[in-house]
Structure formats: structure tokens, C-alpha cells
């Protein structure tokens, strides 16, 4: 007996569901054609060819059910590494796909310059008279604008290639085998569209490696756990080392800072304009979120040299050798044996 999963697409959040499903169809067909041994998400087609059904009750799709487990958060570094491999493999399998064929399901989603421009415009307009109470957060975000916009600026200068990106690389968007905890398949492809590899890497790190939840009220506890960072980077680069350009590799560390700052601008802009986009549980929820992302970004600044060194070390090792699937490299950037993860102190 086969099991299936029926979903109704949220057409309020995604106002172009047909194009969204076409994006998914194109990338999953590419994966099945070029990498038939890989498991990929698959939505079934009607006789007329569409991989969706529209009726009076909504916009529907049908996929195979995959027996599995998911993790919202996880301290098991092997699971984190496997998640990194899953998202890295997703990138690798689509490295030869022309990203310009895809529709932008959320236009300007990671155009950090435009996010900042919108924040500054709303700051000037101050529609809800809230700017005065968040002046300190605004001033810090504006002080790091150029650093936060580095990925956008490099792409606009033609120095980074356009890739197919997932754009929601949380660990809970990977299905894992219940017994072995090996990654089975990447899911939730609704935001698949053109982007930069740093968007996927940076957002995964921003979410997975923070010591606290993104709405922790004690922002001083926020920071990047370098053990988790190392684990994810190692898995990700094991799969992508051969396909990434050196410029892309050099931006992976700063991408984490950029994505934290970008999300902080979004939370803060939403607060300034009346909490219209993100769901809130209490009046200052978006301020709390903003402060937590700022604290995370500040902590990343203090660890940026280590973050860049970890990425460079993993990339150099994996691009130059054919390591067996379960073989563990022993050299680390801090000169200690990797058993199995030994990055600089996560508490530093």
C-alpha cells in the first residue's frame, strides 16, 4: 500500500502558485534526470500534465509520503552535518541548471540593499511613531549596511554566479531516516528560485547555530556555536567543493552575518510599520526578534576569522581529495585532532 501526502498551497503567502509549482517541477525533473540514484521530492501530474489541481476549495498538490523524522532543532553534530550534506547535495545536483529559467516566487527576497532602502524609507515616514524607541537598533544596522550588503553588491558587480537556491534551509526542511539519522531528502521547495549560494548557507547557519531561539528575550545569550557551524559547513562543502567558485567560498562566512542583519532589518521594518507581516505573540515581539538577530550578528563579527578559516579548510580538503563517504579528516584549522568536531571554542 502506497501512502501519499495531499497539500493545499497557501495562495495568500504565494500569489503565483502555478509558477511556484513549475519551478518545483523543473528542478525535481532535472534532479531525477541527471541524478536518478538520488531521492527527490516529487509531485504527481494530472493527465493534462500539471503537477497541481485547482478547484473551488483551493490549490492542491499530491506527493509520495516518505517515512521519516524531522528535527526542529538538534544538538547532535552528526545530524547537523547530514543536514549540511543534504542542502549541499541539493546545490550540487542543480549546479548545471540554468537558474534564470525559474520564476522569482518572492521578488527581491534576498536583495539586502533593497531591504535596507525600505527600512530607511519607513524610518523616515515613521507611520506608527515607533522610530524613537528603536533608534539604537536602527543606528547599528545602518552602521554595518555595506558589510551586510556585500553579497548583493558582489552579485551586482558580476562576481558571484546566479544559482538555484532553496531559500528556507532550516534543519526541519530535511527528512531523516528514523534509525540512522541519515538525510533522505530536502523538502519544502516552495521558495526555490534564483539566488546566491551564500543565501542558503548563511540562512542555515543563522538558524541552526544560534545558541538561542530567534525570539529569545535575553539577546545577550545569542551567538554562533562554532561546533554546529563546523558540522554544517563540513557536510555542505563535502558536496559542493567541486562546484563552487572561489569567490563563492570566500563569501560563505560573511553570508551568515549578512543574513542575520537582513532578517533584523525585516523584523525592525515590520515593527516600524505596525507589525503587518510577521505574526506576533505580544506587542514587542518584533523588537525582541530584531535585538536577537543583532546580537547574533555582533557575535559573528568577533568570530568571523574563525568562520572563514573553517570554510576555507573544509573546501581545500574536499576539493582536493576523494574521501570515502565515512572517512573523517583529522586536520583542523586550530591544529587539533577532529574527534569528530574540534573547532575553536563555541563559547568564545
Feature map (PLM): residue ranges:
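Short acidic (Asp/Glu) and glycine-rich catalytic loops that position anionic groups and cofactors
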Residues: 2-7, 180-185, 208-215
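Conserved ATP-binding subdomain of kinase catalytic cores across diverse folds
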Residues: 2-3, 9-117, 197, 213-214, ...
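ATP-dependent phospho-/nucleotidyl transfer catalytic cores
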Residues: 14-18, 69-81, 96-166, 171-185, ...
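Activation of the activation-loop gatekeeper triad in protein kinase-fold domains
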Residues: 187-191
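Active-site activation/catalytic loop segments of kinase-like enzymes and analogous catalytic loops
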Residues: 194, 198-242, 258-277
